[in-house]
Amino acid sequence: MTTPKAIIFSKNQIETLKKYSEQNSPNEACAILFGNNTDEQVIIKEIFLAKNIDESPVNFTISNEELIAAYGSAEKMKLDVSGIFHSHPVSVPHPSSTDKKYMEINPIPWVIFSNINDEFKAYIYNSGIIQIPVKVL
Ligand SMILES: [Zn+2]
């Protein structure tokens, strides 16, 4: 995937992700974002809320079962897996060293929400961590 110029959410999607992050606090919340990877700008179409099996305030893991289910429903909806979302309940929305490691393995947009400053930021790995503007339409 090339580096998109922006990642675009609807107001409702932003509210859904914020609410889910608050519900999961003090642990990290996670979700899989569906869209269309052919777009120069990634427009998020659907959100697949996932369980953080680590139940940790500093890490997240999505089970293989849920990953398989997510890929299955993306395919049914003729959408691509366009991003990975997780929250940072106790820190700013910058990738942790663990995040950076997994971003390199999985070079699609990573969206991080911080519960402490109510901010969404997106990044992608492309020979280094690059920030992608988050837009709300
Ligand atoms: Zn993180």
Labelled PLM ranges:
Residues 1-81, 90-137:
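Conserved beta-strand-loop surface patch within small alpha/beta domains used
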Residues 87:
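Short, well-ordered beta-to-alpha junction loops that form the rim of enzyme active sites
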